[in-house]
């Protein structure tokens, strides 16, 4: 189902093969959709006295899980592709190396990016090529290289602690 729905085409490293998600997401999400459908049907029955027919398929749900990527395609015309741990629309939103391991960054807006830059005493947020998320998207590789050079001097716990301050 992950392959037929397109989910595998957007999962994995950019230069790698399509990959399955590490857990049975299609089965899990279908179960969750079923619970929601049953709750809605029970509510409808309580209100109208009429029962409902619920019809779910693994493929429909697997396809629904690609909604954000589908929206990107429908609004830009650009087919989604694998980005590894990078977010397709937000930078930095990825795994980075630290002195003793890795952490996942999720810097979701320009204010957070300014605060994040200050952890490293960097003026990245003041540079036009990094000051806004659209600019960071265009200059993703350059920025991620700068970030990675700096995160490697922190332990994971120290960097997480610094990030949690903002």
Predicted regions: what they are:
Residues 91-166:
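Aromatic-enriched alpha-helical interface/lid elements that frame and gate functional surfaces
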Residues 1-103, 107:
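Active-site-adjacent "lid/gating" segments in soluble enzymes
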């Amino acid at each position: 189902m992950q392959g037929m729905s397109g989910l595998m085409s957007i999962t994995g490293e950019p230069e790698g093969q399509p990959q399955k998600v590490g857990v049975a997401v299609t089965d899990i999400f279908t179960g969750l959709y079923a619970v929601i459908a049953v709750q809605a049907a029970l509510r409808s029955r309580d209100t109208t006295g009429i029962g409902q027919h619920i019809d779910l398929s693994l493929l429909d749900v697997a396809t629904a899980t690609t909604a954000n990527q589908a929206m990107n395609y429908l609004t830009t015309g650009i087919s989604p592709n694998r980005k590894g741990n990078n977010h397709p629309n937000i930078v930095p939103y990825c795994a980075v190396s630290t002195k003793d391991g890795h952490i996942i960054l999720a810097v979701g807006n320009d204010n957070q990016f300014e605060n994040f830059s200050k952890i490293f005493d960097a003026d990245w947020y003041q540079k036009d090529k990094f000051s806004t998320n659209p600019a960071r998207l265009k200059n993703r590789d350059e920025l991620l290289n700068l970030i990675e050079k700096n995160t490697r001097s922190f332990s994971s716990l120290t960097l997480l602690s610094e990030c949690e301050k903002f």
